[in-house]
Amino acid sequence: MSQHTQDNQINNNETIEIQETDTVPIETNSLQSGLTSLIPMILIFAVFYFLLLRPQEQRRKEREKLVREVKKGEEVLTNSGIYGIVTKVSENDNNIEIEIAKDVRIKAIKSSIIDITSRKKEVAATQENNKKNKKVICAKSS
């Protein structure tokens, strides 16, 4: 009898039960936590883009347009602080010639131009003339 119980114990130890399941459980908590940790990073990038990158890109485009449209006879300011009048614009090698005093000319790269001061003077003069015209019109109508 003892041998029979030993055989049953051996048979019981050798059997493996396999349970079939229809679906495998997925951990949704880890997936959700991964997405929620990305949201602050995306928000930080969006703020960084709209506050720093986009305005800088707009300023760069305005500056490129300014440099592209420089003409002979305009008064300019270079990044080294030199005021002068453009005497020659070279399209093929991206250089300009600036007269800083009578018979004193320097050669500079177009990208060294910071501002075209003669255009600002024209705009200011136009605005001043408009104000004077309004005053004259108001005085005549009174």
UniProtKB/Swiss-Prot annotation:
Transmembrane residue ranges: 33-53
Subunit organization: Part of the SecDF-YidC-YajC translocase complex. The SecDF-YidC-YajC translocase forms a supercomplex with SecYEG, called the holo-translocon (HTL).
Sequence segments annotated as region (Disordered): 1-21
Listed name of the protein: Sec translocon accessory complex subunit YajC
PANTHER family: SEC TRANSLOCON ACCESSORY COMPLEX SUBUNIT YAJC
SMART domains named among the record's database cross-references: YajC (SM01323)
One Pfam family in the UniProt entry: YajC
UniProt similarity note: Belongs to the YajC family.
Keyword field: Cell inner membrane, Cell membrane, Membrane, Protein transport, Translocation, Transmembrane, Transmembrane helix, Transport
Entry membrane topology: Single-pass membrane protein
Domain of life: Bacteria
GO-annotated cellular components: plasma membrane
Any one biological process term the GO annotation gives: protein transport
Subcellular location: Cell inner membrane
UniProt function note: The SecYEG-SecDF-YajC-YidC holo-translocon (HTL) protein secretase/insertase is a supercomplex required for protein secretion, insertion of proteins into membranes, and assembly of membrane protein complexes. While the SecYEG complex is essential for assembly of a number of proteins and complexes, the SecDF-YajC-YidC subcomplex facilitates these functions.
